Amino acid sequence: LTHLFANNMTSRNGGHILNVASLAAWTPIPNQNVYAATKAYVLSFTQALHDELKASKSGVTVTALCPGYTATKMMDNPAQGGKLLVPSSMLQSPREVAEQGIEACLAGRSTIVTGLANRITVAITRLFSKMALAKIAGRYYRSNMH
């Protein structure tokens, strides 16, 4: 589907595609393995396509939007009567995520990780063992799922 839109935009000499990945693409979390894997695919696919289209001078840019925790229904924990999976102070509003995604599109960026705390998380993930971070995140999720 992305290639179909990219071909159409290329014929018009410009356009932008925004694919939604996630912070989970950078920091895989136990108990969310399929989600993290699909988001990692979206991130990798988007970055590769961004470079392909940039090299071809198509005028089309592709951006991966990687939001962290966002105040949506996905953050509700039905096992605990709808209690949030994370503290509300960690949540971004959908509007904040959308605005940062649009800014990244306009700047022609291949990737945007929304929110300062999330960008710091990605930087730490790149510096330290993913295994250690996954264990910490896994403990947090397991303690909040029961």
What are these regions, as identified by a protein language model?
Residues L4-N13:
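A short helix-coil junction within the Rossmann-fold of NAD(P)-dependent oxidoreductases
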Residues T111-T125, G138-R139:
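Short-chain dehydrogenase/reductase
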Residues E52-A117, M131-A134:
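SDR active-site lid
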Residues S22:
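Residue(s) in the substrate-gating loop at a strand-loop-helix junction
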Residues I29-N33:
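Active-site loop immediately N-terminal to the catalytic Tyr-X3-Lys motif
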Residues T2, T38:
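Active-site helix of classical SDR
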Residues N19:
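Rossmann-fold scaffold of SDR-type NAD(P)-dependent oxidoreductases
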Residues N8-M9, T27, A48-V60:
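Active-site-adjacent segment of SDR/Rossmann-fold oxidoreductases
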